[in-house]
UniProtKB/Swiss-Prot annotation:
This is Putative actin-depolymerizing factor 8. InterPro entries: ADF-H, ADF-H/Gelsolin-like_dom_sf, ADF/Cofilin. One of its GO terms (cellular component) is cytoplasm. Belongs to the actin-binding proteins ADF family. Pfam families: Cofilin_ADF. GO terms for molecular function: actin filament binding.
Amino acid sequence: MEILGFTVMGGGSPAWIEVPEKSKSAFWELMRRKVHRYVIFKIDDRREEIVVEKTGAPWESYDDFTASLPADAVYDLDFVSDDNCRKSKIFFISWSPSLSCIRAKTIYAVWRNQFRHELDGVHFEIQATDPDDMDLEVLRGRANRT
């Protein structure tokens, strides 16, 4: 049976969506090598795999990042902690505006959980439906609580 373009297996859950090495590599380059400030992912047109839609250079700002949304992405936040130490935390940001169509939200909800578990090394997850949910100060506040 097919639901929203996904093949449904016996348990009623959508089929596994492939996470190619190129997508995983983009995340590792962000996390380990600091090659990217952010990576934005999407489901390919065939709905078979998660691909990199865009990467941001290390010098790009949070405003550059948010201008590329809505999408699901990882963001490497550099900040100065409350005890005056330079730190970096990686956020998985799931941006699904409340006005998005239900079909799109459903498709992305299916892959989001699976994909998030592929990204070992993410410190925080933010599920945003409004720009205020992912304001830079929200990220800084979450990062400083650790």
